[in-house]
Amino acid sequence: MMKVLVVVALLATLISYSSSEGIDDLEADELLSLMANEQTRKECIPKHHECTSNKHGCCRGNFFKYKCQCTTVVTQDGEQTERCFCGTPPHHKAAELVVGFGKKIFG
């Protein structure tokens, strides 16, 4: 029985060592991915800023990604143009309010 335990311990050690090298490789890949995401996050459009030219480039808020909300603006010349800004849609505001309220009560 003792021999079986020694063999199992040896196998567990070998498996953990070989998987740790694989994990190191995965951690390096994950770090590169996080750095790329951070660069993308820096390039995103903040809340209340104009997103007319890039409607899918809004940043993330606390819980949800901001949505590009557009309105039609009529100039003094009578021209209609579309102006867009990054903001929180009403249903996301409601969800954030409920979550915030829940955190205050249960948190």
From Swiss-Prot:
It comes from the Eukaryota. It is found in: Secreted. Transmembrane segments: none annotated. GO terms for cellular component: extracellular region. Its main location: secreted. Keywords: Disulfide bond, Knottin, Secreted, Signal, Toxin. Expressed by the venom gland. Disulfide bonds join C44-C59, C51-C68, C58-C86, C70-C84. Residues 21-41 form a propeptide. Belongs to the neurotoxin 19 (CSTX) family. 04 (U1-Lctx) subfamily. The presence of a 'disulfide through disulfide knot' structurally defines this protein as a knottin. This is U1-lycotoxin-Ls1b.
